[in-house]
Amino acid sequence: MSCKAFQGQTLREHIEAMLAAWEIVKNKYIPSIIRVMKTVGVKFTEEDADKFMKTLIILHDVGKCSEVYQKHLSNNEPLRGFRHELVSAYYAYNILKDMFKDETIAFIGALVVMMHHEPILMGQIRSLDKEELTPEVVLDKLRTFNGVMEGTESFIKSMIKEKLGVIPKVPSPTQEDVLREVIRLSVLARHRPDSGKLRMVVGALLIPLVLCDYKGAKEREGESPKFAEVLRVEMMK
């Protein structure tokens, strides 16, 4: 399978570039990941934090393996509002739960993946607030989703085995599965008694993921002027 992340860059190439970026900055971010996860009762070792972030990197864009997204990249067919992050979050929740055997880790990881393009959604899904992520909104963002490309499951398994040495259970998402899971996660996020703390944790985890995502995209299209200085500073050893 050759799933594209962008025009001119396969998903594997994008993941590889992000993982390379993570290796450069991880010593800066692993301590903060351990600290923020501790606030929600998760005791990460350095190895756990590294494994968690690498899993997020591998899974954050797997929703782009959706048939609708690949047709958009290959044939310029319209996405009609489709958001790949929602499918990616479904994968992240199920795979993280299988790998870590912990509901909180899976829950938080899925939210991070769901929101990793939050700053650029421009009025589509800007937050986890009720008015932003209603069932109607989620359904609208998934109405053109009709499954993923053949080979997606084996791609995910091979990437995680190659990078982390484990073979996870990988679900086969239907539109109904993704819709139900995303709505459930968003409801839980809004109504937990520690929702304020949860926002802080998700925000802290988004920083290294988004940084590596920009770095991975830079390998394809070059630095954007506004982000170039941030990249130069953060990627310094």
Curated annotation (Swiss-Prot):
Residues 4-215 form the HD Cas3-type domain. It holds the Pfam family Cas3_HD. InterPro entries: CRISPR-assoc_Cas3_HD, CRISPR-assoc_Cas3_HD_sf. GO terms for molecular function: endonuclease activity; exonuclease activity; metal ion binding. Its EC number is 3.1.-.-. Optimum pH is 7-8. Keywords: Antiviral defense, Endonuclease, Exonuclease, Hydrolase, Magnesium, Metal-binding, Nuclease. SUPFAM superfamilies: HD-domain/PDEase-like. Belongs to the CRISPR-associated nuclease Cas3-HD family. CRISPR (clustered regularly interspaced short palindromic repeat), is an adaptive immune system that provides protection against mobile genetic elements (viruses, transposable elements and conjugative plasmids). CRISPR clusters contain sequences complementary to antecedent mobile elements and target invading nucleic acids. CRISPR clusters are transcribed and processed into CRISPR RNA (crRNA). Cas3 plus Cascade participate in CRISPR interference, the third stage of CRISPR immunity. Acts as a ssDNA and ssRNA nuclease, probably with both exo- and endonuclease activities. The keyword Magnesium applies. Its cofactor is Mg(2+). PROSITE patterns: HD_CAS3. One of its GO terms (biological process) is defense response to virus. This is CRISPR-associated endonuclease Cas3-HD. ssDNase activity requires Mg(2+), ssRNase activity does not require cations.
